[in-house]
Amino acid sequence: MNAHKERLESNLLELLQEALASLNDSELNSLSVTRVECSKGKHHAFVFVLSQDHKILSKLKKAEGLIRQFVLQASGWFKCPKLSFVLDNSLEKQLRLDAIFNEIAKGKDND
């Protein structure tokens, strides 16, 4: 990945956290953005949020305009990528893998 894209994604992640914190919705205020992945042309960004509630995605979709407006004002950028919000299940996957490794380790201890 090139340095420019990494910097853009990092800046966008910080701005999105600030944008969510500035909204008047307590559910959206408490969300954590775990990572941002921009497309090659940087016209589109996938925003991964940490939540178990699928309903939060519809709230984020409704607030996308306000979030993009905040990002534009705070960054001074000419354009803001279109945002697609995705539930981040990487933590859940990591917990499952840890449980599997623990079972394997217990099996070796019993041998």
UniProtKB/Swiss-Prot annotation:
Family to which this protein belongs: Belongs to the RbfA family.
Reported function: One of several proteins that assist in the late maturation steps of the functional core of the 30S ribosomal subunit. Associates with free 30S ribosomal subunits (but not with 30S subunits that are part of 70S ribosomes or polysomes). Required for efficient processing of 16S rRNA. May interact with the 5'-terminal helix region of 16S rRNA.
Protein name in UniProt: Ribosome-binding factor A
Subunit structure and binding partners: Monomer. Binds 30S ribosomal subunits, but not 50S ribosomal subunits or 70S ribosomes.
Keyword Cytoplasm listed: yes
GO biological process, any: maturation of SSU-rRNA
Gene3D superfamilies: 3.30.300.20
InterPro entries per the UniProt record, alphabetical: KH_dom-like_a/b, RbfA, RbfA_dom_sf, Ribosome-bd_factorA_CS
One GO cellular component, as annotated: cytoplasm
Lineage, top ranks: Bacteria, Pseudomonadati, Campylobacterota, Epsilonproteobacteria, Campylobacterales
Amino-acid biosynthesis keyword on record: no
PROSITE patterns: RBFA
Secretion signal span: none
UniProt gene name: rbfA
Location(s) in or outside the cell: Cytoplasm
Keywords, comma-separated and alphabetical: Cytoplasm, Ribosome biogenesis
Pfam entry (one): RBFA
Protein's organism: Helicobacter pylori (strain Shi470)
